[in-house]
Amino acid sequence: MAQALPPLPYDYGSLEPHVDATTMNIHHTKHHQTYVNNLNAALDKFPELKDLGLVDLNKAVGTDKLPKDVATVIRNNGGGHYNHSFFWKVMTNPSNTNGPNGDVKAAIEASFGSVDEMKAKFNAAAAGRFGSGWAWLSVKPDGSLSIDSTPNQDNPLMTALPDVAGGIPLLGLDVWEHAYYLKYQNRRPEYIAAWWNVVNWEQVAENYKAAQAGTVPL
């Protein structure tokens, strides 16, 4: 089955003023679409890989399940497709975001001491990622939460890679320049701080519930 660009769960301007509509439009219809196109082109060369879903393709990165001819293409573009599909869902209109509560808040407090401390560590990971990449809040196999950053389009599902800590993602932030440069230019920390205003904590809670059941959210 061919991979497809998912529709956004909101309008391009819904995240204003924190993430601008022009950036969202270009990010979704150009950057994400390119990852989908490149991934499908790679899968066309190896039809047997089409039986793998997007999550399983990402989990296969760094293993011998992927032919060498397309391993890097799938790592970059399969990662890009998963990461962005996940990213769109963990954002929402600023009026709909109220902060974490319930089980996910308790898990954050158990792992980091407080929500504010978690945010501080997450901000540091996002701001400190040299070049392009992502910051992640993930559930580890022991049930604890951790914060990591990955380069380029790598993600916590790619556990076979030597520099990936692994886990099930709950929250992710794109810190590639194309995610923020039109509005924030080189002010990445300002973008990161603004982004918390559009985090969809209800979706994060759903992701946590899925992770507790061993399911990878997408």
Swiss-Prot record:
Binds 1 Mn(2+) ion per subunit. Keywords: Manganese, Metal-binding, Mitochondrion, Oxidoreductase, Transit peptide. One of its GO terms (cellular component) is mitochondrial matrix. Mn(2+) binds at H27, H84, D174, H178. The keyword Lyase does not apply. InterPro entries: Mn/Fe_SOD, Mn/Fe_SOD_BS, Mn/Fe_SOD_C, Mn/Fe_SOD_N, Mn/Fe_SOD_N_sf, SOD_C_sf. It is found in: Mitochondrion matrix. Destroys superoxide anion radicals which are normally produced within the cells and which are toxic to biological systems. Belongs to the iron/manganese superoxide dismutase family. This is Superoxide dismutase [Mn], mitochondrial. The gene is SODA.
